[in-house]
């Protein structure tokens, strides 16, 4: 019987660049806020961007506050029924800055309706905006960006790790973009057996985290189902360091900005060491070697002009582990090792006062080693990408954007693989792997956003991509509309064609098959009600039709484009915020997903046809320093293919399993409860946060897979390694 497991994390924020012993003199910012007619605006918010320093205007429109922030800053003025205004200012230490501001009345522009607190953005259907603070506070998410996303409707965790499946699609149909670059392998332990994967993306390094589960715009290509669009911070606004210490990992990060504000840098380093965690939690899982991982990254930012910015993003990750796994013909350790390098150089500037031009150049390398019995492979994927985007308004009601990109990819695989899938012994027959494939993809898009009225917005675009390996091109038109019903509610609809070219792994064996680009057509209709971010309700229905999916031929390792399928479903989302104590949301998804994985067969349940998924997340502030939270998840079990019998193969001294209809079985219902608590305090005169989390409170034995004995006459459950942990 499992004993209660303990897991405690400590966050410590320390200044790497302390002030001098002399007290820094505070500066004063004051002034008045009026409307166009000269009347004072009461209750207007005045705040320094990126800080909590600010004030609110009184009945005479007057405001005044003190701040220790100095140098080049942006001050934001906003008020109900008025448009937001930003002012660039220079704040001198000990000085007084007087700012008298006039605010214009807001026009409630439909294309500018943005919900920022873990909700959705109109005009781009199914878009979820997350904040780093919310990500770190979600119980069970372990401060992981991708795990946090799975608490929203439309997405599911893959094997309780960080990889996600969206709206009945395959995880390979989800693509991450970082500052315009494609990020293909942002995970530690991504492909290991019964092991939770973790994201290499540091949410605190992101200024924009936007997740779209369908109906996304023409700027995104070569992806069928969903997009996670990340924007890293530009010039840091401060300097300091942040430390993290836990039972299983530790990390250190920091930011720096020079005095003139023209150079900045960030860094983050992390080390994953599971041995203390295993010993404290009395984990009986057998590891060889014990899981370890490292992650190192950062940015360098140069301000080249008033609007020009050059930013270099770097990230390196490494993981290594082995976990005990039993199969009918081999009982040993499944071992995997991964090395990943990602870098992106981006330059952006404003050619005019209202336009933006950006260009990025990125490179990534992903090296993987996998071994289990006779299987022993080493693969390496290289990606290079150049992309340019331009956006500008052409009139008061019309914005246009366009872009062009070229991406290079090569995939190499060496080693050996079993000839017979049912014989994995170390001395089993095998064939040698020694393959290399290269390809390129060129893409171009253009998009228009037109406001017919204050309540009606249309966004339409088209993109085209060309794949050099198969010499095939695609054209993808996309359209979305938003109509405001009332000040707080609107309806939205979207449709579009989406293509994704087959991965190079499908072209590795024998002659290059004539594979077509995979295609999905999205149809989305939704309703949303949002009252000042304190009450949000969203209901969205969708239908996706798949064609030209890569399918397996009954001839081993031959592939065709005969696959097809569909997904239909409904997503519901409800969020309630009761200031300042409570914040929580409920998400529900219904999915019906069918596909034809093999050539000529009927449609069956897809691998991620998870019919019902419900998540409930809550957070309660007991005081200004103490916060508790809880998450409850329940979902339909994943489909699987049962074994109904076996045939003995004397040449291999092994049994060949006889399978029932593909994905005709279901795992038991998945359920899990997670809780956490956070306490803010001072440690050695520095800001610190103590964080405790109890995952899988009821120690539910969620099924990972079934294993079978030598002749498949008996089976037993292999439960997930995500048992109860604190």
Q: Which residues fall in each region the model found?
A:
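Short, acidic, small-residue-rich periplasmic hinge/interaction motif at the N-terminus
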Residues: 20-26, 34-39, 44-49, 78-82, ...
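Short, acidic Ser/Thr/Gly-rich low-complexity loop/linker segments typical of extracellular
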Residues: 51-62
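Periplasmic N-terminal accessory/gating domains of Gram-negative outer-membrane beta-barrel systems
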Residues: 83, 93, 119-216, 227, ...
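Transmembrane beta-barrel wall of Gram-negative outer-membrane proteins
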Residues: 242, 248-271, 285-320, 334-359, ...
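Membrane-embedded beta-barrel scaffold of Gram-negative outer-membrane proteins
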Residues: 358-362, 484, 517-584, 589
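Surface-exposed extracellular loop regions of Gram-negative outer-membrane beta-barrel proteins
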Residues: 367, 415-424, 468-470, 474, ...
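Gram-negative outer-membrane beta-barrel transporters
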Residues: 453, 543, 561-644
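C-terminal beta-signal and adjacent terminal beta-strands/loops
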Residues: 584, 625, 634-651, 670-674, ...
């Amino acid at each position: 019987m499992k004993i209660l497991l303990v897991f405690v994390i400590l966050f410590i924020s320390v200044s790497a660049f302390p002030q001098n012993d002399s007290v820094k003199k505070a500066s004063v910012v004051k002034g008045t806020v009026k409307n166009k007619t000269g009347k004072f605006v009461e209750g207007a918010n005045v705040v320094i961007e990126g800080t909590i320093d600010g004030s609110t205007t009184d009945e005479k429109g007057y405001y005044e506050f003190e701040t220790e922030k100095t140098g080049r800053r942006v001050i934001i003025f906003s008020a109900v029924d008025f448009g937001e205004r930003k002012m660039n200012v220079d704040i001198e230490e000990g000085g007084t800055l007087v700012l008298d501001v006039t605010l214009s009345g807001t026009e409630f522009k439909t294309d500018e309706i943005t919900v920022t607190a873990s909700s959705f953005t109109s005009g781009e259907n199914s878009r979820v905006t997350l904040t780093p603070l919310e990500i770190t506070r979600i119980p069970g998410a372990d401060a992981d960006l991708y795990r946090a996303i799975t608490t929203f409707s439309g997405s599911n965790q893959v094997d309780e790790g960080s990889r996600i499946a969206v709206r009945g699609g395959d995880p390979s149909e989800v693509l991450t973009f970082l500052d315009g670059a494609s990020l293909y392998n942002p995970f530690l332990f991504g492909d290991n057996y019964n092991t939770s994967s973790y994201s290499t993306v540091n949410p605190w390094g992101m200024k924009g985290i936007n997740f779209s589960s369908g109906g996304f715009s023409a700027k995104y290509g070569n992806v069928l189902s969903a997009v996670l669009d990340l924007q890293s911070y530009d010039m840091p606004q401060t300097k300091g360091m942040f430390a993290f210490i836990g039972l299983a990992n530790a990390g250190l990060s920091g930011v720096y900005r020079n005095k003139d504000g023209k150079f900045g840098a960030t860094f983050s380093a992390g080390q994953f060491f599971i041995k203390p965690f295993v010993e404290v939690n009395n984990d009986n899982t057998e590891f060889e070697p014990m899981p370890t991982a490292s992650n190192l990254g950062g940015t360098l930012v140069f301000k080249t002009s008033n609007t020009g910015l050059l930013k270099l993003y770097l990230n390196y990750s490494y993981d290594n582990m082995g976990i005990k796994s039993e199969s009918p013909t081999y009982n040993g350790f499944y071992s995997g090792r991964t090395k990943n390098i990602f870098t992106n150089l981006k330059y952006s500037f404003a050619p005019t006062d209202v336009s933006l031009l950006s260009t990025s150049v990125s490179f990534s390398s992903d090296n993987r080693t996998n071994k289990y019995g006779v299987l022993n492979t080493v693969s390496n994927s290289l990606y290079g990408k150049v992309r340019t985007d331009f956006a500008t308004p052409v009139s008061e009601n019309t914005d246009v954007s366009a872009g062009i990109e070229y991406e290079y990819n090569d995939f190499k695989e060496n080693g050996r693989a079993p000839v017979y899938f049912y014989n994995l012994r170390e001395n089993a027959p095998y064939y040698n792997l020694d393959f290399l494939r290269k390809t390129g993809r060129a893409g171009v898009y253009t998009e228009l956003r037109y406001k017919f009225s204050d309540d009606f917005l249309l966004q339409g675009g088209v993109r085209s991509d060309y794949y050099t390996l198969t010499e095939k091109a695609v054209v993808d038109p996309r359209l979305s509309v938003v109509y405001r019903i009332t000040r707080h509610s609107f309806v939205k609809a979207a449709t579009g064609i989406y293509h994704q070219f087959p991965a190079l792994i499908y072209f590795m064996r024998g002659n290059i098959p004539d594979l077509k680009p995979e295609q999905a057509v999205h149809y989305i209709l939704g309703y949303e009600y949002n009252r000042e971010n304190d009450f949000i309700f969203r209901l969205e229905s969708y239908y996706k039709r798949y064609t030209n999916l890569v399918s397996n031929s009954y001839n081993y390792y031959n592939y065709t484009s005969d696959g097809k399928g569909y997904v239909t479903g409904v997503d519901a989302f409800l969020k309630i915020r009761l200031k300042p104590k409570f914040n929580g949301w409920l998400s529900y998804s219904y999915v019906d997903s069918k596909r034809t994985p093999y050539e000529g067969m009927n449609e069956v349940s897809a691998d991620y046809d998870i019919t019902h998924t419900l998540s409930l997340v809550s957070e309660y502030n007991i005081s200004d320093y103490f916060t508790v939270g809880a998450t409850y998840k329940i979902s339909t079990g994943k489909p699987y293919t049962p074994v109904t019998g076996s045939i003995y193969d004397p040449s291999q001294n092994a049994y060949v399993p006889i399978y029932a209809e593909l994905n005709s079985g279901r795992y038991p219902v998945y359920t899990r409860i997670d809780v956490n608590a956070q306490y803010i305090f001072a440690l050695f005169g520095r800001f610190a946060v103590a964080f405790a989390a109890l995952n899988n409170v009821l120690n539910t034995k969620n099924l990972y897979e079934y294993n079978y004995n030598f002749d498949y006459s008996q089976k037993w459950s292999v439960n997930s390694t995500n048992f109860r942990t604190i």
